[in-house]
């Protein structure tokens, strides 16, 4: 039996809505030939399956085993053609590609004038929506046609096309360079996490500024600014400069708020910008502004003119619920947060083919933290085990580390003393494999190791000593992020004061919100 996720045709069919399936069958009906009925039979069979099973297909004798591969490829292609014809999938890029195809067909038939007319309209549409890669492709085809279709205005036309091609090429090279830089920074973040020391910081900073082009930001168009800000956001996250990440993510979102027509043209970038802004607001502990940003994003995505497709639906879920959880951790409303867990687990199942394992595991970690916050340590452990037992998981080392540490603390709180020693051993073995450990992680593990030797009447003082030791790292540039993954200080305060961790965090959030916050300059 082939895994569902590896059988692309099966996954594609399962992703279709009822209307898309209906349209596909109508599309096949218009084709009408006996050979086509085979792939429709295969479509209907796969649509009814809960899991992909090749043997069931062969038992139906739709085709022989040798023919099945070709039939699946043919069906896959026909589904994509049907989807392309669906008005729901007609975004700007698809429309432009369609017009370019039409112009190419007319050119091949020698109908140069008609081809140029279509290209001129398509080019205007591409430039209005900052689709400059497509615009460049259109100009290149215009140049090819003009070289064969001689007119009296050729001289002026040549100068215009050459100027447009040069300008678009320059803009596209800049965007390509900045997108490469962003991708390299993102890869560094996923593989190794955030900078851990001055050496890391110098290495990343040297790389970033060596790669960063010297430009005047005011001279950049919308798309070029977008990539420029994105690269700076990733650099700021990597170097843990949270005010800088707030600054550039704010500029990113403000661009869309100023040019709202770009939201419809580039909805993914709109969502990502808001997500990075909210992550920055979490890092600088600004819950009031965070709520405003989350509410504005939720309102925007429900508007009629916001594009609708499966990719956007999964991203909207990812960014909305991930940030709802972040808000809960900032405010300490853990019991209220439990209400969203059924929604999250249901949507994780619905979007399983759209979300990568890394993001799914982050949800599991945050759900575990929710249960930890309401003293439900057994459920906390259940979700942590989903991460720990996933041996094929490619996840950030720092998150995997705190998953292990939280598991040790949860086992201690749950009273699973018989598991605690094994947990500590496994955690130590895992941490030894890591390149660099934070001092916060070292201190927590040292404390947990000697817990069994501490008498009950000495516990409170031991918690106070650890709290004092960890507090020294709270404002350390490289250590402070550790407290975001695992609010160990609030846990220690709850043990010292005999109060729930939710009470402690809620009290801190109220103090934060009562503080007079001056607007943070982003210029």
Where are these regions (language model features)?
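"A position-specific structural signal for the A-helix of alpha-solenoid helical repeats
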Residues: 97, 101-105, 134-137, 141, ...
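Alpha-solenoid helical repeat architecture
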Residues: 130-137, 172-179, 219-226, 261-272, ...
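Flexible inter-repeat linkers and adjacent short helices
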Residues: 1-207, 217-219, 455-523
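Helix-turn-helix repeat elements of alpha-solenoid scaffolds
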Residues: 73-77, 110-120, 151-162, 195-212, ...
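Active-site/pore-lining binding-face segments in mid-to-C-terminal subdomains
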Residues: 389-458
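Alpha-solenoid helical-repeat scaffolds
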Residues: 175-292
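Alpha-helical linker/edge segments of TPR/alpha-solenoid repeat scaffolds
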Residues: 143-158, 164, 168-172, 183-190, ...
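Amphipathic alpha-helical segments of tetratricopeptide repeats
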Residues: 120-128, 162-170, 205-217, 250-262, ...
């Amino acid at each position: 039996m082939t895994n569902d996720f590896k059988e692309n045709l099966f996954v594609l069919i399962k992703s279709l809505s009822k209307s898309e399936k209906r349209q596909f069958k109508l599309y096949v009906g218009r084709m009408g030939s006996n050979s086509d009925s085979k792939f429709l039979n295969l479509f209907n069979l796969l649509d009814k399956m809960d899991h992909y099973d090749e043997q069931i297909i062969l038992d139906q004798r739709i085709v022989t085993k040798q023919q099945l591969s070709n039939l699946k490829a043919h069906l896959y292609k026909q589904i994509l053609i049907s989807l392309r014809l669906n008005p729901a999938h007609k975004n700007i890029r698809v429309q432009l590609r369609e017009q370019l195809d039409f112009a190419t067909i007319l050119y091949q038939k020698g109908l140069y004038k008609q081809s140029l007319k279509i290209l001129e309209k398509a080019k205007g549409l591409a430039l209005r929506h900052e689709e400059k890669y497509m615009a460049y492709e259109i100009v290149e085809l215009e140049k090819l046609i003009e070289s064969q279709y001689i007119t009296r205005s050729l001289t002026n036309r040549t100068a215009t096309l050459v100027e447009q091609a040069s300008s678009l090429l320059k803009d596209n090279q800049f965007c390509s360079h900045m997108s490469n830089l962003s991708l390299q920074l993102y890869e560094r973040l996923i593989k190794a996490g955030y900078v851990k020391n001055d050496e890391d910081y110098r290495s990343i900073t040297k790389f970033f500024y060596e790669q960063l082009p010297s430009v005047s930001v005011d001279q950049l168009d919308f798309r070029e600014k977008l990539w420029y800000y994105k690269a700076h956001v990733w650099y700021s996250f990597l170097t843990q400069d949270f005010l800088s990440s707030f600054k550039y993510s704010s500029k990113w979102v403000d661009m869309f708020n100023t040019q709202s027509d770009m939201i419809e043209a580039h909805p993914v970038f709109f969502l990502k910008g808001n997500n990075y802004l909210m992550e920055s607001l979490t890092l600088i502990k600004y819950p009031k502004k965070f709520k405003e940003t989350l509410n504005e994003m939720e309102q925007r995505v429900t508007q009629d003119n916001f594009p609708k497709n499966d990719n956007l639906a999964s991203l909207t879920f990812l960014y909305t619920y991930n940030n709802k959880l972040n808000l809960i951790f900032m405010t300490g409303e853990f019991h209220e947060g439990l209400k969203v867990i059924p929604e999250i687990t249901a949507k994780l199942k619905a979007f399983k083919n759209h979300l990568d394992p890394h993001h799914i595991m982050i949800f599991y970690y945050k759900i575990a933290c929710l249960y930890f916050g309401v003293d439900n340590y057994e459920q906390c452990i259940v979700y942590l085990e989903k991460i720990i037992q996933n041996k094929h998981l490619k996840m950030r080392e720092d998150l995997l580390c705190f998953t292990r540490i939280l598991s040790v603390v949860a086992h201690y709180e749950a009273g699973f003393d018989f598991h605690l020693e094994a947990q500590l051993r496994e955690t130590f073995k895992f941490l030894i494999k890591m390149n660099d450990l934070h001092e916060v992680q070292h201190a927590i593990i040292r404390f947990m190791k000697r817990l069994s030797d501490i008498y009950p009447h000495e516990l409170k003082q031991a918690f106070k000593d650890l709290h004092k030791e960890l507090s020294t790292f709270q404002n350390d540039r490289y250590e402070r992020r550790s407290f975001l993954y695992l609010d160990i200080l609030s846990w220690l305060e709850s043990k010292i004061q005999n109060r729930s961790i939710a009470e402690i965090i809620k009290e801190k959030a109220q103090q934060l919100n009562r503080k007079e916050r001056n607007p943070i300059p982003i210029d």
